[in-house]
């Protein structure tokens, strides 16, 4: 058994979808003993918003790639895990020459995990949420200020909330920062 990290190509912007598809296939095929981790490495960066406001956001380090820790099997005969990864919707193939993927070096893996904050760093605290799905909220800032709507989705990791507001007589989903809404 040789457990290594491998990089696979995905469609840019479809990394999360490819990861979700792969995780479903791992469970469906019972390969938790062959495929151990699937990562989309990200790093925290500060972006400057309107009005000079700074916001910390997570950006993908390697758009178009997933990193998978797995046991690929023998040189001559890759195992079922190899086929499951290659056949996953959204994954276009392993990084490597010919038929055999090339594993990442320990230094590459350590660097990716360190920059992502997964090795030797604490996870950033998550934002506190003052409302739940289905709650009525009022928008207090931005282009939709003074609109009211219903919370349909909450993303604490990104500090975002999706609210259905009525614009020109139509229900429209709007993604807002937590700081832009208050409970009605």
UniProtKB/Swiss-Prot annotation:
<dbReference type="GO" id="GO:0005829">
    <property type="term" value="C:cytosol"/>
</dbReference>
<comment type="similarity">
    <text>Belongs to the NusG family.</text>
</comment>
<keyword id="KW-0806">Transcription termination</keyword>
<dbReference type="InterPro" id="IPR006645">
    <property type="entry name" value="NGN-like_dom"/>
</dbReference>
<protein>
    <recommendedName>
        <fullName>Transcription termination/antitermination protein NusG</fullName>
    </recommendedName>
</protein>
<dbReference type="InterPro" id="IPR047050">
    <property type="entry name" value="NGN"/>
</dbReference>
<dbReference type="InterPro" id="IPR015869">
    <property type="entry name" value="Transcrpt_antiterm_NusG_bac_CS"/>
</dbReference>
<comment type="function">
    <text>Participates in transcription elongation, termination and antitermination.</text>
</comment>
<dbReference type="InterPro" id="IPR036735">
    <property type="entry name" value="NGN_dom_sf"/>
</dbReference>
<dbReference type="GO" id="GO:0006353">
    <property type="term" value="P:DNA-templated transcription termination"/>
</dbReference>
<dbReference type="Pfam" id="PF00467">
    <property type="entry name" value="KOW"/>
</dbReference>
<dbReference type="GO" id="GO:0032784">
    <property type="term" value="P:regulation of DNA-templated transcription elongation"/>
</dbReference>
<dbReference type="GO" id="GO:0031564">
    <property type="term" value="P:transcription antitermination"/>
</dbReference>
<feature type="domain" description="KOW">
    <location>
        <begin position="133"/>
        <end position="163"/>
    </location>
</feature>
<dbReference type="InterPro" id="IPR014722">
    <property type="entry name" value="Rib_uL2_dom2"/>
</dbReference>
<dbReference type="InterPro" id="IPR005824">
    <property type="entry name" value="KOW"/>
</dbReference>
<dbReference type="InterPro" id="IPR043425">
    <property type="entry name" value="NusG-like"/>
</dbReference>
<keyword id="KW-0804">Transcription</keyword>
<dbReference type="Pfam" id="PF02357">
    <property type="entry name" value="NusG"/>
</dbReference>
<keyword id="KW-0805">Transcription regulation</keyword>
<keyword id="KW-0889">Transcription antitermination</keyword>
<dbReference type="InterPro" id="IPR008991">
    <property type="entry name" value="Translation_prot_SH3-like_sf"/>
</dbReference>
<dbReference type="InterPro" id="IPR001062">
    <property type="entry name" value="Transcrpt_antiterm_NusG"/>
</dbReference>
<dbReference type="GO" id="GO:0140673">
    <property type="term" value="P:transcription elongation-coupled chromatin remodeling"/>
</dbReference>
